[in-house]
Amino acid sequence: SDVYKRQGKTFFRLLFSVGLLIPGAALLQPLYQTMIAMGLYDSLIGLILVYIAFGLPTTIYVMSSYFMTIPKELEESAYLDGSGFFKTFSLIVIPIAKPALGTAAVLEFLVAWNEFQFALTLTASNSNRTLPIALYYFKSQFASNYGAMFAATILVIIPSIIVYIALQEQVVSGLSAGAVKLSLIHISEPTRQAE
């Protein structure tokens, strides 16, 4: 039964990872028609749902990679102490996974903050446009005020820099923890075989 559990986990992880291979441009037309049919065209809720849907594969990939590095002994000892699944998950696993949560949050924030294609296609009114779209329409039809455009660009970039600097430690540790754990596993396997 343990083999089936592992195969099921691998299947669902691969299923969500396939979302990383699908380009967003290939889904623009169906998304546009779906948003109109659902009454979500030109709404921030519709745009947020699209960002969440396209951000899930990356988030699941980062989080599942990190969860695999957490020693099972921690969870098993919590179960032996009488802790249930949800208590173990919320009090042990989530605090350990803070670097991965920070990494996923920063990655998805940066993607959503700088996204242009969906915002241009799925919004029409000025009140629902994102900052990259506002920058795109910042220039007038016959003249361009480059000084104002560059100032607006700097103002749009500043929040991304602040978020990255604030969570830089978590991003670096979240990205490197999985690689360190995997390399330790590969190093320890030959020594086990030699014994």
Question: Which residues fall in each region the model found?
Answer:
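Short, small-residue-biased leader/transition segments that mark boundaries at the very start
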Residues: 2-4, 186-192
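A structural signal for multi-pass alpha-helical bundles of membrane permease subunits
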Residues: 1, 5-181
